[in-house]
Amino acid sequence: MTDHTGSRFKRWKKPLTIAFFLLLIVLFTLLARRIGWSEVIQTLGDFKWRTLLIAAGLTLCSFLVYACFDLIGRTYIGQPLRWKQILPVGFISYAFNLNLSAWVGGIAMRYRLYSRLGVSTGNIAKILGLSLATNWFGYMALAGVVFSSGLVTMPPGWKVSTTALQGIGALLVLVSLGYLAACQFSKKRAWSIRGIEINLPSLRMACLQLALGALNWSLMAAVIFTLLPAKLDYPLVLGVLLISAIAGVVTHIPAGLGVLEAVFIGLLQHEASRGSLLAGLIAYRAIYFICPLLIALVMYLGVEAKAKALRVKKTPA
């Protein structure tokens, strides 16, 4: 990309993002007016404890899988950190990342917590980069298979047709395979970006990245599937979640608030009532976003209190 093309892209990126965001607000407002809120309240009240516990268990599994991204990072940087040190950092970072944006959770929180464990700034950046790669290459591999298989049928009138979605899926599969091929066959294994050396992982590590990343997205979909009407198929719910993730990234809204709901209702309102869909998504927000954030906040305050106690202990009288 030339400098002229790059500057033109930057100039148009913000207006296009704002326009997309406004479009989603209009869409969600129109949908909200057509939703039977009495049905939403009734559906929320009708949830069985067994259903909520299953969703909570799947949420815990998802957070543990995401925290394991940093275990790959430990191997990547070659620093002897214990899993008991890494998993809490991954859990806390993910909870803050989901609710307060990647800058707060993915970046700031990881830098603060890992620096307390004696990890250098360069190695923290490598762990962060590998975690992002694990998440999004896993997404591309899974979305590629789901989209290209035709499991998701786009409603009439949508800008992206089912055929176009299948084409996007095929492209994502090719990108995923290209990443694996690069990890196996590339002769150049290292690059320097702003003074930080980035090393291409081994094929084994790359396969583990794709597997864990795809598993986490699958578990997220399983939580939503558990809370939505029973007549919906899991592959369809998974596909819609993967589509909504793209919209969430484009808008940069923390937690994708409103975006997830607009996409799910827009794509599934012909399969189930809008009220039942929104009720399930509200329950999903509470179980997958709010509850883990509260737990992560307590964990983080505990880490800070422990660090403060150690500083006081080391300070001479």
Feature locations, PLM:
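Predominantly cytoplasmic-facing regulatory/coupling regions of multi-pass membrane proteins
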Residues: 1-91, 139, 148-249, 274, ...
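Residues at alpha-helix boundaries and short interhelical turns
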Residues: 34, 81, 99-100, 104, ...
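Membrane-interface alpha-helices at helix entry/exit sites of multi-pass transporters
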Residues: 84-88, 102, 107, 116-133, ...
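Transmembrane alpha-helix interface/packing and boundary motifs in multi-pass membrane proteins
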Residues: 93-101, 242-262
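Mid-bilayer segments of alpha-helical transmembrane spans in multi-pass integral membrane proteins
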Residues: 94-104, 132-144, 148
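Transmembrane alpha-helical cores of Major Facilitator Superfamily
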Residues: 95, 130-133, 246, 286
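Re-entrant/interfacial helical elements at transmembrane boundaries that shape
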Residues: 104-116, 145, 254-269, 282
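Interfacial segments of multi-pass membrane proteins
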Residues: 113-123, 239-240, 244, 262-277
